[in-house]
Amino acid sequence: MEALVYTFLLVSTLGIIFFAIFFREPPXILTKKTK
């Protein structure tokens, strides 16, 4: 159970950092795919 908690915290922190950097910079590739 501890392993699951640690992995969840690790993935959540990495996801927050990734989204922070992703939304801070202009997503040119994402806009091209969506449009």
Curated annotation (Swiss-Prot):
Keywords: Chloroplast, Membrane, Photosynthesis, Photosystem II, Plastid, Thylakoid, Transmembrane, Transmembrane helix. It comes from the Eukaryota. The chain crosses the membrane at residues 3-23. It is found in: Plastid, Chloroplast thylakoid membrane. One of its GO terms (biological process) is photosynthesis. Found at the monomer-monomer interface of the photosystem II (PS II) dimer, plays a role in assembly and dimerization of PSII. PSII is a light-driven water plastoquinone oxidoreductase, using light energy to abstract electrons from H(2)O, generating a proton gradient subsequently used for ATP formation. Belongs to the PsbT family. This is Photosystem II reaction center protein T. The lineage of its organism: Eukaryota, Viridiplantae, Streptophyta, Embryophyta, Tracheophyta. The gene is psbT.
